[in-house]
Design a protein with these regions (language model features):
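C-terminal amphipathic/interface module of NAD(P)-dependent oxidoreductases
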Residues: 275-348
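Substrate-positioning beta->alpha
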Residues: 95, 143, 171-177, 192-214, ...
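NAD(P)H-binding glycine-rich loop region in Rossmannoid oxidoreductase-like domains
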Residues: 51-91, 99, 114-119
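Conserved beta-loop-beta element that borders a ligand/cofactor-binding pocket
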Residues: 145-169
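N-terminal Rossmann NAD(P)H-binding glycine-rich loop of SDR-like oxidoreductase domains
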Residues: 7-27
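Glycine-rich Rossmann NAD(P)(H)-binding loop
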Residues: 168, 190-196, 223-232, 243-246, ...
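Conserved Rossmann-fold NAD(P)-dependent oxidoreductase catalytic core, especially the SDR/UDP-sugar
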Residues: 95-137, 151, 159
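Mid/C-terminal beta-alpha module of Rossmann-like enzyme folds, strongest
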Residues: 216-275, 291, 311-312, 324-326, ...
Length: 348
């Protein structure tokens, strides 16, 4: 592919964005970022930063000027209200596509989610499986994919990536609960005990395949791809690796699924727990996708297993833990306020 290696990253100040911008800069790309939040200080003199909303055509145009391609990683989060989720994830995606096409960009990589499949007790889900998005977030992501497919052409390739839950340096959010409990010498309870296989993904592997989607032949990239780890065990065994690494001799513990689900659901509705129903239900079934298409067309060969990715993320957490002690929020880059879970932690 013949271009100047100038890429726009929407959502460049989020968890994926931080890792992707760093990955691209290390490999000689010119990077422009569009985000509501400023970039990390380490990037300030190395990128073109545009503070703005992906729903604003002028902001997207300013970021896309002179670029060859765009990675659309900006998205509303599942904890936000349904109207905001749809506006950002559907209307924002459409706006980015329209501007990118008008500005003459040749490649668009849309970061979707396996949430478009809904929650099914299934391994090796293929890209042609029926879409059954769970909740406002999953439904909006599925609708955004429909928008993306309408823009595909030989001159404007639109790759849709559906990553599993991805982790690594800078990731906190729901995984911050596990790391906090492990670092404090606590066991970790899982509804149902975690005796099912659950595929994750290291953010470094996701960054690698994004670049593959940017640089592969259009006839290969102009498709939809599942992205996940190739090596993973049960949720119990993979989470236990974090507790073992912490070195306190603690174990993953089983909570009865139905009572735990009822209590967590009530606590979330009352604003006393960050664990929303989709997370709970997703953690109680087998969940993995088939990555054969990405392997064959994009050369995707994940370097990290679930355990590798979890330990790598936990090591980063331990190095940076002090800076997060008084910060909470709803994004993936800060700890979530534990609410009642912080009190329950004392029991384990």
């Amino acid at each position: 592919m013949n271009f100047n290696r100038h890429v726009v990253v929407t959502g460049g100040s989020g968890f994926l964005g931080i890792n992707l911008v760093r990955y691209l800069l290390e490999r000689g790309w010119k990077v422009s970022v569009l985000d509501l939040e400023p970039c990390r200080p380490e990037f300030a003199t190395r990128i073109h930063m545009v503070i703005g909303d992906i729903r604003d055509p002028d902001a997207v145009r300013q970021a896309a000027s002179g670029a060859d391609c765009l990675v659309h990683a900006a998205a509303a989060l599942p904890l936000q209200d349904s109207a905001t989720i749809r506006s950002v994830d559907v209307d924002g995606t459409r706006n980015c596509l329209e501007v990118a096409q008008r500005e003459g960009l040749s490649r668009f990589v849309h970061i979707s989610s396996t949430a478009v499949y809904g929650i099914h007790d299934q391994l090796n889900t293929c890209e042609n499986a029926a879409l059954d998005g769970m909740g406002p977030y999953g439904r909006a992501k599925a609708e955004a994919e429909i928008v993306c497919r309408k823009f595909r052409s030989p001159d404007f390739a639109v790759a849709i990536l559906r990553p599993k839950s991805f982790i690594g340096p800078e990731r906190l959010g729901i995984f911050g609960l596990l790391y906090d409990w492990a670092a404090d010498g606590r066991g970790f309870p899982l509804p149902g005990g975690g005796n099912h296989r659950f595929q994750l993904l290291d953010v470094a592997d996701l960054c690698h395949v994004i670049v593959q989607a940017l640089t592969s032949a259009p006839e290969h990239a102009n498709r939809t791809f599942n992205i996940g780890a190739s090596e993973f065990g049960t949720l119990k065994s993979d989470f236990q690796a974090v507790l073992d690494y912490a070195g306190f001799g603690k174990r993953v513990l089983r909570l009865p699924s139905s009572p735990a689900g009822w209590m967590l659901g009530l606590a979330h509705r009352l604003g006393l727990s960050p664990v929303y129903p989709w997370v709970f239900r997703n953690l109680t079934v087998n969940s993995a996708v088939d990555i054969t298409r990405a392997r064959n067309l994009l050369g995707f060969h994940p370097s990290y297993s679930n355990r590798d990715a979890l330990i790598r993320n936990f090591e980063w957490y331990l190095r940076h833990r002090d800076q997060w002690r008084r910060q909470t929020g709803i994004t993936h880059t800060v700890p979530w306020a534990q609410g009642l879970l912080g009190l329950a932690k004392r029991l384990f």
